[in-house]
Amino acid sequence: MADALPFEAAYLDEVRRSFRGYKRLADGGLTQLSDQDFYQLPDPVSNCAAQIVKHMAGNLRSRWLDFLTTDGEKPDRNRDQEFVLTPADTRADLMRRWEESFKIVFDNVASLKPEDFAETVTIRGEPHTILQAINRSLMHTAYHVGQILYVGKHLRGAEWTVLSIPKGKSAEFNAMKPEDRKVKLPSRP
């Protein structure tokens, strides 16, 4: 039997899988939204998918750019403006920022080494262990991916393609071979 990976190496592998999985889920939801749906507020106090994408792109870029060497709240970030859509915030531009921010995450996570866990990083001037900073970002990402999927499902209704196990299909799913359990992501309407 092979030796187990040290905790830090195993954890970094899981972080890579988690961020890629969250992005895959969000992308699977976003592809189901028409341009109108992308900008549609579900209610007066909630955010539309476009606002969530803009905010997540800003947050991920800020937290992960120069992750080990600069504060996670970059001076050029304006968090409040991430929730304000302007005519310049086309779907194509927001999705470009989305892709760029996730590339920053993927590149920085890939560059982390187990010995980096001895370092401390700051977010808004507050010290965080590497573990705390990564967990904070994973939690924030999962939270907003869930919002994107909920908004999408709310707007698309019966036209929504479920990205996990559909209601009433758990037994059928559990009976499948693990290699056959992949959920096919929908194409954009």
Where are these regions (language model features)?
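Short, contiguous alpha-helical
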Residues: 2, 12, 16-20, 24-27, ...
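C-terminal ligand-sensing/allosteric alpha-helical core of TetR-family HTH transcriptional regulators
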Residues: 59, 63, 97, 101-108
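A short, structured beta-strand-centered segment in the mid-to-C-terminal lobe
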Residues: 86-100
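A short N-terminal helical cap/helix-turn-helix that marks the beginning
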Residues: 110-114
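Active-site-proximal loop and beta-strand segments within enzyme catalytic domains
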Residues: 119
